[in-house]
Amino acid sequence: MSLEGKIASQGKAEARAFVTNNPLEKPPFEDYILVTQNSDPEISPLLYNAKGIITEVGGLMSHLAVVSREIKIPCITACENSYDELKTGYNLKIDATAKLNSRVGIEYDF
């Protein structure tokens, strides 16, 4: 199965999904790709151990995109329905090696 979004930070990542909007929620596993609805700065504490980020909103200059480029992890923005469709524990694969702001697919399975 797959979803589509825009590349806001380049790179590749493969890990389990951690779906949350709560910056105080503890990740259930060490390696994860953060899936969130928004790009608010409050979610930042969860970024530094994430292998990648997927968000339903935002763009190249959103907070999550800027921070993800600084810490060199892939970030996909404008990924509609990702928060509802993806569940914590799903296996995700991001290949965001194309140019910034181009459309990219996100592969996932249960």
Predicted regions: what they are:
Residues M1-F110:
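Non-catalytic, soluble scaffold/interaction modules
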